[in-house]
């Protein structure tokens, strides 16, 4: 695993910054927590710059806390993945959701492409080399489940696994029901909660999202550490789902 100094600050240095966030094509001023920037050490300066390219959103399942969790996951995965460049990986994590597309939008399957395009623009303005830029944009493009792409570089494999780890386990449970609430979905279908005799509809029922998507995610991990962590989190996810169904008497 490699790292270089481009965009890095001195170890322990805290960047105090005020970041400008996109919202519907307009720049907005908003203060960014120095502690959040510090979480991306030794790439605090890079984080402070790239975060200005993020859409401002009220989606708590794809907020700054999500970026921090994905970065924590990515650093763990990179320890066992040969050839990963930590700085390129940090840039990919920071920009992987820079264009926000709501779950119910017809453009949802284009979210990673749109984010990759903006990521390329951001890195070009920072003067990044074409090869490094391409590694980052490829990782951003491939990370999305909706895109259905297979990652081939270490950075892309790590980002995809790190992002998907945040969709399973207990955090995944919380994000699932949070998103369902935002979209106005019901908790479950009252006549057949487990969907044994009907087509699953996770746009209408939060619980349907477990068998339709979440419970199948653990089989698609491509990094060594990612597979191991996915098995652990999948067990928590399955236990929650089974317990929920049991309480409903279904």
Language-model regions: role of each:
Residues 86-105, 111, 115, 135-145:
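His-Asp-centered metal-binding catalytic motifs of divalent-metal-dependent phosphohydrolases/nucleases
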Residues 70, 111-124:
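An active-site-proximal "capping" alpha-helix that borders the catalytic cofactor pocket
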Residues 30, 36-38, 55-82, 95, ...:
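Divalent metal-dependent phosphate-bond-processing catalytic cores, especially two-metal-ion Mg2+/Mn2+ enzymes
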Residues 122-157:
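Hydrophobic, well-structured mid-protein blocks that either form specific transmembrane helices
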């Amino acid at each position: 695993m490699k790292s270089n100094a481009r965009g890095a600050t001195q170890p322990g240095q805290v960047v105090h910054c005020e970041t400008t966030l996109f919202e519907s094509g307009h720049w907005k001023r908003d203060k960014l927590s120095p502690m959040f920037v510090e979480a991306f050490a030794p790439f605090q300066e890079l984080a402070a710059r790239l975060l200005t390219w993020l859409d401002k959103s009220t989606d708590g399942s794809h907020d700054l806390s999500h970026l921090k969790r994905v970065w924590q996951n990515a650093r763990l995965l990179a320890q066992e993945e040969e050839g990963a460049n930590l700085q390129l990986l940090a840039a990919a994590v920071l920009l992987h959701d820079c264009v926000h597309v709501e779950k119910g939008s017809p453009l949802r399957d284009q979210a990673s492409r749109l984010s990759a395009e903006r990521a390329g623009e951001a890195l070009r303005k920072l003067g990044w080399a074409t090869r490094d830029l391409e590694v980052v944009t490829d990782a951003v493009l491939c990370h999305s489940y909706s895109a259905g792409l297979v990652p081939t570089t270490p950075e892309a494999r790590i980002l995809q696994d790190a992002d998907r780890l945040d969709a399973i386990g207990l955090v995944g449970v919380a994000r699932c029901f949070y998103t369902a609430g935002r979209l106005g979905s019901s908790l479950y279908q009252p006549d057949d909660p487990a969907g044994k005799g009907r087509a699953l509809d996770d746009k209408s029922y939060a619980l349907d999202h477990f068998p339709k998507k979440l419970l199948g995610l653990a089989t698609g991990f491509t990094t060594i550490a990612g597979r191991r962590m996915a098995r652990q989190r999948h067990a928590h996810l399955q236990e929650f789902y089974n317990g929920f169904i049991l309480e409903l008497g279904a």
